[in-house]
């Protein structure tokens, strides 16, 4: 009987990649158009004035200005206040 006993398997041995979520530009910081402001899952923050939302709920600046966090209708929103020229 030249058989080998079955080796035991492990229930560990896997790890997920980091997601790098969170706020990337804080209130008062200056941004250019296209810069990512918040990476999130779901709409913890909603897009406000001059802010767009990607298909993965990422918020990004549509125009240059400074970031402003606030609340509207009980929701947290992110606005871009255009720089005074």
Swiss-Prot record:
GO cellular component terms, semicolon-separated: cytosolic large ribosomal subunit
Classification via SUPFAM superfamilies: Ribosomal L27 protein-like
The entry's keywords: Ribonucleoprotein, Ribosomal protein
GO MF annotation terms: structural constituent of ribosome
Region (Disordered): 1-25
Coiled coil: none
Short name of any one Pfam family annotated for the protein: Ribosomal_L27
Positions with biased composition (Polar residues): 7-19
GO biological-process terms attached to the record: translation
Superkingdom per UniProt: Bacteria
NCBIfam families in alphabetical order: L27 (TIGR00062)
Family statement: Belongs to the bacterial ribosomal protein bL27 family.
PANTHER family linked: LARGE RIBOSOMAL SUBUNIT PROTEIN BL27M, RIBOSOMAL PROTEIN L27
Protein name per UniProt: Large ribosomal subunit protein bL27
Organism annotation: Micrococcus luteus (strain ATCC 4698 / DSM 20030 / JCM 1464 / CCM 169 / CCUG 5858 / IAM 1056 / NBRC 3333 / NCIMB 9278 / NCTC 2665 / VKM Ac-2230) (Micrococcus lysodeikticus)
